[in-house]
Amino acid sequence: MKNKIFIIIFASSLLAGCWNSGGHGDETYIVATDATLAPMSFMSVGNDMIGFEPDLIRAIADKAKINISLVNVEWAGLFGGLITKKFDMIISSVTVLEERKQRMGFSIPYLKSGLTLVVRKDEKKITSFEDAKNNNVLVGAQIGTTAYYFLEKESSIKTKGYQMYGHAISDLINGKIHAVLGESSGTLFLKNQPLFQEVKIVGEILSNEFYAVVLRKDENQLMTQINLAIKKLIADGTIAQLHKKWDLGQAAQVP
């Protein structure tokens, strides 16, 4: 039953996210993203997939002269779905990590970002990540993300995993955890949204992370096309324009 449900959702997403970049042959590459983190990738009120990364992958497709179809897939299913050929690429704020490179191929980076810590607005003891370490607090993070891995390495911090970043924020507001660690550009964008009126960002941006398009390791020709397209989009200022359009600010930089 789960497989049937996935196929129905997957097919619906294909219809919603098709992008024909014009005159680039018949083959269409399926690109997966977890559209739950504004402004990187999220669903509009009209149920369109929008954000920095949907715009970017469409620009990459134009430069690479390929056709793509965007699908919305939960984070937990991204890597397995790619490896089992349910789709051909991932663009979803995926950080380049050595352990991930053993299983998948990564393009050159299109963005540099980091991690930020969020606490309730009435929190007085935690003003930085060091404070969180020293106070032995419970910190939430989305499972399978670099924020979650980052916390796992800190023995002085108790970690609680979530399938979605927004669920962690809800638990924070309700006093079930003390803080949330997440991707900096999405966190800074959301700070002015209604859900974030009860929380605040503390401390500096943690870590240096590079985001890349993810492919299967054997897709050498496609990887070459994607890398060349990203280089052109960096050189002609397109990625910088998208950075400005989606108000990523100092939370993320173009390489």
Segments predicted by a language model, with ranges:
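C-terminal motif of bacterial Sec signal peptides marking the signal peptidase cleavage site
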Residues: 14-17
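Ligand-binding clefts/hinges and TM-proximal coupling segments of bilobed small-molecule sensing domains
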Residues: 20-21, 146-162, 201-202, 230-255
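Extracytoplasmic small-molecule ligand-binding "clamshell" domains
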Residues: 24-93, 102
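Beta->alpha turn/N-cap motifs
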Residues: 32-37, 71-76, 85-97, 142-145, ...
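Periplasmic-binding protein-like
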Residues: 35, 112-119, 184, 188-231, ...
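Short helix-initiation/N-cap motifs at beta->coil->alpha
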Residues: 54, 69-80, 127, 160-174, ...
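A ligand-binding cleft/hinge motif common to bilobed small-molecule-binding domains
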Residues: 80, 92-102, 150-153, 173, ...
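Flexible hinge/capping segments at coil-to-helix
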Residues: 120-137
